[in-house]
Curated annotation (Swiss-Prot):
Organism listed in the record: Mus musculus
The keyword Acyltransferase belongs to this UniProt entry's keyword annotation: no
Tissues expressing this chain: Detected in the brain only and specifically in neurons. Expressed in multiple regions such as cerebral cortex, thalamus, hippocampus, olfactory bulb and brainstem as well as in cerebellum with high expression in granular cell layer.
Entry protein name: Sodium/potassium-transporting ATPase subunit beta-1-interacting protein 1
InterPro entries hit by this protein: Na/K-Atpase_Interacting
Organism lineage string: Eukaryota, Metazoa, Chordata, Craniata, Vertebrata
Length: 207
């Protein structure tokens, strides 16, 4: 029962991670955020690997999944620092999230709750084929939305890491005990015996 509860809990957290990652991937696609798109794709693959390892009792897959979660926590911590401009990080310095391929920002910048977008006509700040907009009235600015989204990812990743370590430890202990007691012999397994189709004939000797 304990093993099942641990596995079921890990699968549930993996499913939550998958839903949160897909939701985030959609909004990053809408905002042309290529660096987060790549990271989200790798994260989705790792979560699927974690689900497969949990269902199929593969401890190695869970170890890889747990190792990825460490990197995932670090990435999301960087995103929080980036959008909140912690230290030397600044959103106006460069466009890290788009690999410097476009001037797009987060999709939430223009589509946040309560945001009112007003085009600025004849602005000298506008580059070629671009326009300047003014965003006002937002109930929550987009840097805080992105930071909250990353904080949610960190929360799920920490719980997933703990349960992945626990379940993989259970799997490894079961594998060790299985090898120690002789594999299939403990379950009454017997190898099939070869049957002979030769018929024995009586041997007569003359006295």
């Amino acid at each position: 029962m304990g093993k099942c509860s641990g596995r079921c809990t890990l699968v549930a957290f993996c499913c939550l991670q998958l839903v949160a990652a897909l939701q985030r991937q959609i909004f990053d696609f809408l905002g042309y955020q290529w660096a987060p798109i790549l990271a989200n794709f790798l994260h989705i693959m790792a979560v699927i690997l974690g689900i497969f390892g949990t269902v199929q009792y593969r401890s190695r897959y869970l170890i890889l999944y747990a190792a990825w979660l460490v990197l995932w926590v670090g990435w999301n911590a960087f995103i929080i620092c980036f959008y909140l401009e912690v230290g030397q990080l600044s959103q106006d310095r460069d466009f890290i999230m788009t690999f410097n391929t476009s001037l797009h920002r987060s999709w939430w910048m223009e589509n946040g709750p309560g945001c009112l977008v007003t085009p600025v006509l004849n602005s000298r700040l506008a580059l070629e084929d671009h326009h300047v907009i003014s965003v006002t009235g937002c109930l929550l600015d987009y840097p805080y939305i992105e930071a909250l989204s990353s904080a949610l990812q960190i929360f799920l990743a920490l719980f997933g890491f703990v349960f992945a370590c626990y379940v993989s430890k259970v799997f490894l202990e079961e594998e060790d005990s299985f090898d120690f007691i002789g594999g299939f012999d403990s379950y009454g397994y017997q190898a099939p015996q070869k049957t002979s189709h030769l018929q024995l004939q009586p041997l007569y000797t003359s006295g």
